[in-house]
Amino acid sequence: MIKGENNIKLIIKKKIINLEYMFYECKSLKNIKELKYLDTKDITNFSDMFYGCSSLSDIKGVENWNVSNVNNFSFMFNGCSSLSNIKGLENWNVSNGNNFKYMFSYCSSLSDIKGLENWNVSNGNDFSDMFNGCPSLSDIKGLGNWNVSNGNNFSYMFNGCSSLSDIKGLENWNVSNGNNFSYMFNGCSSLSNIKGLEKWNVSNGNNFGNMFNGCPSLLDLRGLENWNVSNGKDFSFFYNGCLSLLDIKGLGNWNVSNGNNFSYMFNGCLSLSDIKGLENWNVSNGNNFSYMFNGCSSLSDIKGLENWNVSNGNNFSYMFNGCSSLSDIKGLENWNVSNGNDFSYMFKGCLSLLDLRGLEKWNLSNGNDFGDILNGCSSLSNIKGLERRNVSNGNDFSDIIYRGLSLLDLKGLQKWNLSEQQ
């Protein structure tokens, strides 16, 4: 390994089979022209080779490298923040490569991936973080011919690609072996539609957490209607921060019966006015519903949740926090929340909520945190619906009705069972 050197003169006296970390963090290295004479035919590992070479702007010199025996390309150009194009790689035979994770991650100037069009990545199984942190990348059409059928990990692949406005090039990808799609398009703030994903077979996927988190330009979910997510367990943060998302009808056919984590799923979806499409969801295995609709300030109607089986849910904190347009919650009347222990902030900031009809039958006996549950519900005039409750396990009742400015009638609270409170 040559670490942090400014001027490099490479003299090779014997056969090399491993170039791992060779120029690790050589931050002043600007070009690698002299490497054109390097005999790479026996090399098997290129991982971290140019890791952190932040001044490297030109990769001329590697065009004719024989990389046919290399299996590990992970982190190879990670952190090469001055690298704007990779045209010199078009003739590389990467057919033996199985590990491509972080290969071009944090190449913040990379705007063009011409050179990768004809790569044979058919043996690749790990593509995680491959283009993570490439905010200048606006076009991935060059990946259209990639055979990723052996890939199992696609997590963070395009994470932070904030200039990516469409996903043309991925339409025909065979991702049927993929199990991890978490954070795949996280932070793609210019992405406005995902229609090209309708053919994806994600039936083996179990982790979808944060997949489209932080995609504020995404308008609808057309393209996902027929996704088979039946093996999915983690749906947390899936559409978190999708500020422009108007419609989630495309999720109506999703089988989420194995899902256990739905936290933050639609958190911060400011434009979402209804949740039609979720009415047939089987969430019976879900245990975490915290922040699910937090900050959905346009949500005025929760029709679609009436028949949800939330009997395994233990965390409902912040679930509807900040839903300032929500005026009634009648649709929750049949919810079995008997396993719930955290109800804190659940309806905080629901400024338009007029009454609590829908909560009359709720069994809160296992709840221990009720802090701020109705804080800021300034249109609430009474708390009918919460009478005669056994909340003896509760340890936090702080600010339950703080800033409930219109709350005139507190009758019912005197019938709460607080017998174990000190």
Where are the regions a protein language model picked out?
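Negatively charged
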Residues: 1-422
